[in-house]
């Protein structure tokens, strides 16, 4: 027997075909969300308050500091928040200290700073009752970047950019005349030496002494028109602020605020880390020949002699000396923007490949402390030096698509940035109030206006591009959403501008970002998914784990190191499937490995690391595809994406052929209920589980608190499917931490179960499976194999209008009693009623304009105090094509203290309607290998082809769908699935380490099947065997969310657009089908003049004609000739609005009057025809 039996969760054993033992457990798959939010609450908020404190007034007398904060208890718990359409949030209270410096008085107060949304345990937020996810954003890391570019003459040039987290950009570039320029904040360019002079290097000689002599610098000095620091400062001021009178002081303060003011310029800790790394002498001196000795500044001893070539070993030896500022120089700058002395490290090296022995100076930034978040003059000088070194052939340019240069902004940081915007707006208000208020009676509470803070948080959660409505179609969709990485959003790329290179797979994605899972369409490559083992470090770079190789014994150790993409560039990494002996040494002398972007074969002694698992390359969804290694990547992409669209079925079933990932994905998705502590199950019922904690103290186990786990029963998910949880533990079971207690939707016994295992034959059948169509047995309909439950929510609000309040009532004008049969005495449908489209769910009337009362009405009004009100029917009805059984009704009243209702709403009624949808012709189905199709025919069970033992097969697929698509994984799954079914087992075939051909065939033989996996099939209609033997097996097929019930649509009489009077389009508007210009050509080609005329007039926008046609049909008369279509009138009006006098003439050159229709009768009749409410409809006008 191939493979070994592995336990997945409490209830499921699978035969696993993996050959590589897992050395590392998969991490919690949603920790990217939870950890980031924890960091925000623990450090992010405090850091922000620290950045903004103290706020001082313009005189410096008052100072406001934020000392500490705490989060209170949420007003509503999670469930209540969802029911009430509220936000699940806790009040944020900040301790604020106000110091009045004149008197020395200190006032402390706790100030309420708004409700702060809390993250749920599953990594989501509940905003206005809906679950949302904050998607992590991939952005360029703040740092210094050097790029190579080819100018129009074909010469190689370079440019450089210093990108901060926020603040002004600094760019260097060369021109055709070899002059080096600088741009400050995207303005016009200046010679680079102007900026150097402004920093305090006044004369030409000082600049040459600093940077070393070279022709580029000489050309730049010639171009530079300034002669000293003052002139340079004035020159920069004129460039940045043209039109304003320049003074030296203004210029200094402008330059200071652009680059050296911490409130305006921020590299962030990641920017400082990257800048120090880029400008560090270690990488820049590698393989260079020294033109001067390296001296230890503290002791004065020579560490490395002149003329030495520094290899990696030599550099490692002198690292300590380099970092303790070897060859450092300190410059006292006079008249500069910054008065502090500037320290740099400067080492001369020989220019590579130069016969004349010229030298160039390599300048380092002397390693500023990680707390320095601004750019320093040393950074600017070192970056200029790097630029001149590049021109001399020393140093490397950067690859912007490398993941060492792209980082993640997760929830915590995105929230922090948003909060910072709110606080800085608040800071302005505080300053203004400080100058107005009386210092005697002033309190912190009076100074602080929390509105901008609340607004910025609300705006972020409600309308940011990165705050997305969670896709809850199934557990895998939830999981993938939380692990999604988007390059779009504020501060990111835009779809239109993103080039091929950004979207493409890069070698640095290995183990960090999935190369397969990405959407098809305009977002391809811009939205990605985190790989299964990847994690995010403190700077936001994605790290992936590797097993360390012992450099002495060359054996694999159990030590696991997480490496970022640029750290990995220094090492050689062996693949996870390299053969090892029992001591962990490589068995082959030559090992397949990766070094940077190259896959090569190297000697085993050169290995530094080894992959931890074959599935570390791919994401969670892709790792659920068995035999992924046998599928073409394009089809695997579709397979990974379509699994997320699978509808939760009524009777889910885990796959016979899985990958072992199903259990982990289900557990971490948030759809299952997991144990928060170890304990014993005390009570189980359908809607709650009680677990008594088991606590161990001094080796003795005793009982602790009782944990209560409520289960969600038949709730509506975000995507309109049924969200239901079922217990899978029994009373008395001892459960471990994080063990699954209850299955969620699309789960079975603690494993993800997106579809069903069905018997599939690859054969044609009367051409019904042409073009990927699917032929299905009626058994799957009768036995509810692919039946799903869908819940739709409808709501109706009773508002205050100008003419009086709307009312929810059973008393609706002009409605028959039979239409009210499902309503209770309040006018609301009762639970359990069966409704179809057009039925009233909530009876509601809205007051019409008040008319003058007659004498009789005035008398009645005087007697009864109630006039016969003019109301119109605005009841909530079941929309077209919907219907089902009323599952639940929720009523919210303002009188009963429901403060979550929006302003002007007195009452809100929500009705939930449930539908049981069996599978139909027209529904979309798919397998896990990108093999998708639409059901074309549902065949009676007795007509389906049957196996030799008489069992009819369930589904027939077209064999032509396999060879050209190159997704052979489905065929292997088919055979192994049949074997698993016959043996009564479940199997796991992990990606890139699953069952090979021999395993599949040996399992088939073990199951007693034919060696080739094929069988004779008999035609159910004739009983004759088919000519050839056919591949029949068990495949896991999913029903997708694209169901025909949601798409089928036909218009009767519906709404028209206001301006053109043409029917609206789309199912939501109850619209018509567009008859476009190509369709007009088709009718013209047939000469079908009358058909064409009625399509362009009566059936479209001839307002008079359509009313008269209706009349003629009702009265049985002949239909009159059409009049002028409305769109022609609109065209004339548009031409007239351009000042053109347009007239319409008949054959006798008489003008045809184009009068506007004012026929009241026509307008009224038109209203009667339109029963449906829809956007910008004619009805709104005529009311």
Swiss-Prot record:
InterPro entries: DNA-dir_RNA_pol_bsu_external_1, DNA-dir_RNA_pol_su2, DNA-dir_RNAP_su2_dom, DNA-dir_RNAP_su2_hyb_sf, RNA_pol_bsu_bac, RNA_pol_bsu_CS, RNA_pol_bsu_protrusion, RNA_pol_Rpb2_2. It is an enzyme of class 2 (transferase). GO terms for molecular function: DNA binding; DNA-directed RNA polymerase activity; ribonucleoside binding. Pfam families: RNA_pol_Rpb2_1 (PF04563), RNA_pol_Rpb2_2 (PF04561), RNA_pol_Rpb2_3 (PF04565), RNA_pol_Rpb2_45 (PF10385), RNA_pol_Rpb2_6 (PF00562), RNA_pol_Rpb2_7 (PF04560). Signal peptide: none annotated. SUPFAM superfamilies: beta and beta-prime subunits of DNA dependent RNA-polymerase. GO terms for biological process: DNA-templated transcription. It catalyses: RNA(n) + a ribonucleoside 5'-triphosphate = RNA(n+1) + diphosphate. Gene3D superfamilies: 2.40.50.100, 2.40.50.150, 3.90.1100.10, DNA-directed RNA polymerase, subunit 2, domain 6 (2.40.270.10), RNA polymerase alpha subunit dimerisation domain (3.90.1800.10), RNA polymerase Rpb2, domain 2 (3.90.1110.10). Keywords: DNA-directed RNA polymerase, Nucleotidyltransferase, Transcription, Transferase. The keyword Transferase applies. Its EC number is 2.7.7.6. GO terms for cellular component: DNA-directed RNA polymerase complex. DNA-dependent RNA polymerase catalyzes the transcription of DNA into RNA using the four ribonucleoside triphosphates as substrates. Belongs to the RNA polymerase beta chain family. The RNAP catalytic core consists of 2 alpha, 1 beta, 1 beta' and 1 omega subunit. When a sigma factor is associated with the core the holoenzyme is formed, which can initiate transcription. This is DNA-directed RNA polymerase subunit beta. It comes from Staphylococcus aureus (strain Mu50 / ATCC 700699).
């Amino acid at each position: 027997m191939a493979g070994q039996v592995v336990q997945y969760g409490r209830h499921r054993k699978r035969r696993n075909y993996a050959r590589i033992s897992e050395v590392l457990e998969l991490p919690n798959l949603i920790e990217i969300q939870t950890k980031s939010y924890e960091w925000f609450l623990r450090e992010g908020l405090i850091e922000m308050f620290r950045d903004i404190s103290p706020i001082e007034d313009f005189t410096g007398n008052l100072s406001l500091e934020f000392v500490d904060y705490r989060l209170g208890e949420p007003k509503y718990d999670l469930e209540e928040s969802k029911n009430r359409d509220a936000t699940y949030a806790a009040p944020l209270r900040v301790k604020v200290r106000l110091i009045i410096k004149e008197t020395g008085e200190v006032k402390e107060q706790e100030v309420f700073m708004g409700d702060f949304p809390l993250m749920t345990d599953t990594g989501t937020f509940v905003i206005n009752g809906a679950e949302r996810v904050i998607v992590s954003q991939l952005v360029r890391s703040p740092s210094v970047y050097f790029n190579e570019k080819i100018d129009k003459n074909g010469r190689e040039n370079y440019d450089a950019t210093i990108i901060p987290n926020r603040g002004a950009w600094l760019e260097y570039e060369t021109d055709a005349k070899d002059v080096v320029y600088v741009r400050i904040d995207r303005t016009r360019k200046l010679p680079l030496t102007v900026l150097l002079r402004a920093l305090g290097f006044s004369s030409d000689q000082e600049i040459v002494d600093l940077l070393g002599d070279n022709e580029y610098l000489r050309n730049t000095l010639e171009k530079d028109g300034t002669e000293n620091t003052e002139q340079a400062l004035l020159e920069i001021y004129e460039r940045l602020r043209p039109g304003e009178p320049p003074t030296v002081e203004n210029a200094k303060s402008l330059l200071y605020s652009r680059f050296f003011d911490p409130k305006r310029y921020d590299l962030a800790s990641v920017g400082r880390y990257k800048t120090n790394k880029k400008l560090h002498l270690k990488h820049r001196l590698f393989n260079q020949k020294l033109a001067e000795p390296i001296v230890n500044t503290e002791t004065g001893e020579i560490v490395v002699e002149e003329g030495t070539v520094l290899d990696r070993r030599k550099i490692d030896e002198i690292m300590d000396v380099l970092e303790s500022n070897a060859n450092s120089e300190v410059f006292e700058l006079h008249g500069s923007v910054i008065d502090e002395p500037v320290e740099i490290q400067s080492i001369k090296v020989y220019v590579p490949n130069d016969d004349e022995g010229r030298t160039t100076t390599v300048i380092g930034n002397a390693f500023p402390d990680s707390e320095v978040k601004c750019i320093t003059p040393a950074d600017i000088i070192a970056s200029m030096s790097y630029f001149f070194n590049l021109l001399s052939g020393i140093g490397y340019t950067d690859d912007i698509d490398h993941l060492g240069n792209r980082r993640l902004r997760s929830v915590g940081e995105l929230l922090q940035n948003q909060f910072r915007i709110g606080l800085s707006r608040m800071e302005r208000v505080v300053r203004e109030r400080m100058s107005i208020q009386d210092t005697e009676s002033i309190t912190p509470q009076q100074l602080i206006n929390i509105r901008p803070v609340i607004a910025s948080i609300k705006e972020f959660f409600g309308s940011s591009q990165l705050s997305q409505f969670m896709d809850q179609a199934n557990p895998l969709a939830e999981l993938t959403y939380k692990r999604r990485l988007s390059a779009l959003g504020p501060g990111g790329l835009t779809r239109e501008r993103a080039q091929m290179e950004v979207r493409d797979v890069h070698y640095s994605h290995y183990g960090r970002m999935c190369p397969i899972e990405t959407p098809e369409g305009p977002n391809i490559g811009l939205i990605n998914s985190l790989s299964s083992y990847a994690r995010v470090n403190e700077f936001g770079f994605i790290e992936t784990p590797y097993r360390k190789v012992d450099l002495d014994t060359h054996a694999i150790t159990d030590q696991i190191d997480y490496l970022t993409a640029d750290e990995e560039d220094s090492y050689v990494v062996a693949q996870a499937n390299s053969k090892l002996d029992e001591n962990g040494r490589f068995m082959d002398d030559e090992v397949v490995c990766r070094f940077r972007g190259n896959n090569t074969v190297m000697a085993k002694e050169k290995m530094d690391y080894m992959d931890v698992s074959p599935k570390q390359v791919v994401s969670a969804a892709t790792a659920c595809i068995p035999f992924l290694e046998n599928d073409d990547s394009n089809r695997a992409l579709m397979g990974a994406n379509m699994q997320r669209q699978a509808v939760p079925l009524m009777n889910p079933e885990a796959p016979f052929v899985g990958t072992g990932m199903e259990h982990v994905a289900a557990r971490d998705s948030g759809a299952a209920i997991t144990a928060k502590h170890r304990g014993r199950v005390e009570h189980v019922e359908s809607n709650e589980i009680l677990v008594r904690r088991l606590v161990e103290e001094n080796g003795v186990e005793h009982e602790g608190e009782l944990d209560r786990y409520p289960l969600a029963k038949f709730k509506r998910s975000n995507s309109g499917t049924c969200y239901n949880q079922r217990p899978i533990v029994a009373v008395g079971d001892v459960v471990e931490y994080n063990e699954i207690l209850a299955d969620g939707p699309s789960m079975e016994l603690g494993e993800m179960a997106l579809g069903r295992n069905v018997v599939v034959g690859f054969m044609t059948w009367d051409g019904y499976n042409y073009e990927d169509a699917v032929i299905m047995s009626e058994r799957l309909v009768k036995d509810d194999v692919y039946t799903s439950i869908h819940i739709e929510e409808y709501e109706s609000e009773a508002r205050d209008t100008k003419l009086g309040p709307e009312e929810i009532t059973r008393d609706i004008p002009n409605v028959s009693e039979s239409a009210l049969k499902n309503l209770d005495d309040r006018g609301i449908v009762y639970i359990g009623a069966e409704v179809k489209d057009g039925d009233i769910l909530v009876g509601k009337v809205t007051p019409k304009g008040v008319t003058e009362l007659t004498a009789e009405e005035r008398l009645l009004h005087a007697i009864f105090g109630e006039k016969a009100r003019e109301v119109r029917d605005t009841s909530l009805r079941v929309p077209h094509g919907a219907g089902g059984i009323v599952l639940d009704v929720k009523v919210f009243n303002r009188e009963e203290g429901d403060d979550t209702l929006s302003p002007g709403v007195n009452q809100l009624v929500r009705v939930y309607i449930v539908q049981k949808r069996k599978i139909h012709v027209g529904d979309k189905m798919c397998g896990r290998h990108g093999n998708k199709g639409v059901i074309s025919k549902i065949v009676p069970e007795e007509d389906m082809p049957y196996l030799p033992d008489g069992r009819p097969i369930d589904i027939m697929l077209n064999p032509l769908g396999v060879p050209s698509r190159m997704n052979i994984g489905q065929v292997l799954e088919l055979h192994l699935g049949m074997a698993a079914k016959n043996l009564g087992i479940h199997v796991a075939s992990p990606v890139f380490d699953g069952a090979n051909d021999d395993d599949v065939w040996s399992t088939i033989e073990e199951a007693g099947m034919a060696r080739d996996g094929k069988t004779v099939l008999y035609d159910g209609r004739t009983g004759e065997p088919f000519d050839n033997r056919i591949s029949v097996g068990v495949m896991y097929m999913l029903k997708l969310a694209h169901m025909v019930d949601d798409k089928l649509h036909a218009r009767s009489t519906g709404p028209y657009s206001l301006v053109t009077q043409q029917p609206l389009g789309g199912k939501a508007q109850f619209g018509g089908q567009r008859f476009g210009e190509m369709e007009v050509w088709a009718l013209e080609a047939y000469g079908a003049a009358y058909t064409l005329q009625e399509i362009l007039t009566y059936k479209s926008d001839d307002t008079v004609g359509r009313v008269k046609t209706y009349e003629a049909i009702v009265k049985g008369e002949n239909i009159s000739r059409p009049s002028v279509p409305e769109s022609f009138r609109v065209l004339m009006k548009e031409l007239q609005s351009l000042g053109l006098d347009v007239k319409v003439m008949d054959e006798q050159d008489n003008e045809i009057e184009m009068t506007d229709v004012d026929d009241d009768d026509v307008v009224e009749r038109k209203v009667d025809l339109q029963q449906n409410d829809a956007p910008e409809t004619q009805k709104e006008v005529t009311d």
